Amino acid sequence: PNIVGDLMLFKNEKRVFSTAKLHPGNGNSGLLVSEVKKQMKDNSNKDTAFAVIDGSPGIGCPVIASLSAVDMVLIVAEPSLSGFSDMERIIKTARNFETDIMLCVNKYDINAGITEQIKQMCEKEDILFAGCIPYDSSAIDAINKNKPFTH
């Protein structure tokens, strides 16, 4: 079989962190996401209250794999035409899974008009609006330096 990535598990008495690293040049069909979720479940305590799955951007198979068997999805939308379109599609997909939906807008201040459209759509569609995150160039600097944004 074609191995597209490596599973990694970090665990202590209180937390489990399951992730994977995709090998360069390989695509992710969603099977790797499913394996990451399975590894997390297999290594979590039975009394674990919740787990966070940080899904990939867009609306492809990995995102659909992230949505299976979850109670709630937090959609992080960006106020651009493509971001709005992706948001609409992921909302439709999440509704097919009958999961609760919450939404926030990342970089809300780069396009006030689309941000307002997103808020109005949330109200109209009865989606819990979680808030707005401003654009901050220091976030990009932190990513480029491989440092947490909180430092």
Regions found by a protein language model. Name each.
Residues P1-N12:
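Cys/His-rich short segments
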Residues T19-N28, E35-V63:
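Switch II (G3) loop of P-loop NTPases
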Residues S29-G30, V63-I64, M87-E88, T115-E116:
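Conserved strand-to-helix beginnings and helix N-cap segments that scaffold or border functional pockets
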Residues I53, I75, L103-V105:
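Structural beta-sheet core signal
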Residues G60-L81, M87:
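Inter-motif core of Ras-like GTPase G domains
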Residues S85-R95:
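Amphipathic helical hotspot of TIR/SEFIR-family domains
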Residues T93-H151:
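C-terminal lobe/tail of nucleotide-utilizing enzymes
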